[in-house]
Amino acid sequence: MNRILVVEDEVDLAVTFDRLLRRQGYRVVTAASRAEGLKAIESAPPALVIADLRLPDGDGHDIIRAAHARNPQVPVIVVTAFASRAARDAALASGASAFLAKPFPASALLRLVHDELERSTH
């Protein structure tokens, strides 16, 4: 099954994403910071990344760039509480394939994960 990297500094959300995705059969790796996310990308490139834009030690845009440096086709879903049009446009310009504003229903995330993985393998 596909390996998904979740880069999220809010512990409760990271745990929720992890459980939700594992229940769907995905292998999940979580990272609570930019540094942990970058290390996870280098050690074993994921099939999909879910990343927050605001991280305690830097910018989620670095996660997008690093993921694409390893695999230009890897889908990156940005999840953020900063839901302005400017934040969305900046994330998409950095290479994010999708953008979700917190809070969002679990079904929206699962649909995006499924759709992005399907798209990246075809």
Spans of features found by a protein language model:
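The feature encodes the CheY-like receiver
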Residues: 14, 56, 84
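Alpha4 helix (beta4-alpha4-beta5 surface) of REC/receiver domains from two-component response regulators
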Residues: 62, 83-100, 111
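Conserved acidic carboxylate
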Residues: 8
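Acidic catalytic/metal-coordinating carboxylates
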Residues: 33, 59-62
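Active-site beta3 strand of CheY-like receiver
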Residues: 44-50, 55
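Two-component/phosphorelay signaling modules centered on CheY-like receiver
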Residues: 11-29, 116
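Short amphipathic alpha-helix used as the core "switch/output" element in two-component signaling
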Residues: 39, 61-73
